[in-house]
């Protein structure tokens, strides 16, 4: 809450509202929607960004660890979509829902299996709702980022900066995404300029998934490749 208060102080605004809630709790999200409804506020954009994650081999994963990630990511997304989307439809209001996913929701990944499974579920929830809600002038889009520099998630999953050390090998751009790059893409996708982009999840990973999926791409990381790349 203090971080939200600081942001409002920085932008010197008295017209913004902020709430503290557990997205996995349906009543918490419903209470937010009820408060907005009483103020006659209908969100133009809903960003589904809450997440939870930790590194753990599957055979050492506890039932509670699995359940907590699924509750936050998948059930939290259901709560957000179900409550706000249903209300917009009932009131005949348009809107845009933006889902923040991850590149490994498509590929899967060791050590973050609960998160990968939950994010894949959210991606398909979004795709199904794209078809059901488009007639109501509600558009759904997604962003699938790789590691983001300075984000809370990256700092927790990579306390020793291993991502940065290995970026030269796994990422063609040899760096992590900046928070500004993610926010600017989010602003575009939720704007009227992206009105015809619907049901799509846009990767922003510097080409990392592409590089690591090609059969011979690994050769570009070893000196052997330089002989073929000379002018």
Describe the predicted segments one by one.
Residues 187, 198-231:
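Short C-terminal tail/terminal secondary-structure segment
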Residues 61, 108-117, 128, 153, ...:
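Active-site loop-to-helix junction immediately N-terminal to the catalytic Tyr of the SDR YXXXK motif
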């Amino acid at each position: 809450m203090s971080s939200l208060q600081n942001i409002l102080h920085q932008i010197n605004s008295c017209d913004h509202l902020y709430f503290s809630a557990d997205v996995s709790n349906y009543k918490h999200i419903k209470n937010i929607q009820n408060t907005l409804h009483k103020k006659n506020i209908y969100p133009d954009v809903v960003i589904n960004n809450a997440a939870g994650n930790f590194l753990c081999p599957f055979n050492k994963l506890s039932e509670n660890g699995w359940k907590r990630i699924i509750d936050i990511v998948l059930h939290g997304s259901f709560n957000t979509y179900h409550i706000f989307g249903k209300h917009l439809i009932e009131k005949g209001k348009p809107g845009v829902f933006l889902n923040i996913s991850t590149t490994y929701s498509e590929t899967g990944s060791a050590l973050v299996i609960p998160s990968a499974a939950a994010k894949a579920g959210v991606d398909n929830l979004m795709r199904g709702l794209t078809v059901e809600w488009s007639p109501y002038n509600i558009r759904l889009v997604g962003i699938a980022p790789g590691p983001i520099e300075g984000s809370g998630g990256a700092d927790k999953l990579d306390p020793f900066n291993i991502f940065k050390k290995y970026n030269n090998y796994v990422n063609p751009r040899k760096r992590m995404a900046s928070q500004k790059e993610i926010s600017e893409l989010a602003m575009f996708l939720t704007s009227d300029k992206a009105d015809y982009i619907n049901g799509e999840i846009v990767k922003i990973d510097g080409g990392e998934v592409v590089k690591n999926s090609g059969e011979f791409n690994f050769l570009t990381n070893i000196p052997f490749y330089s002989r073929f790349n000379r002018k």
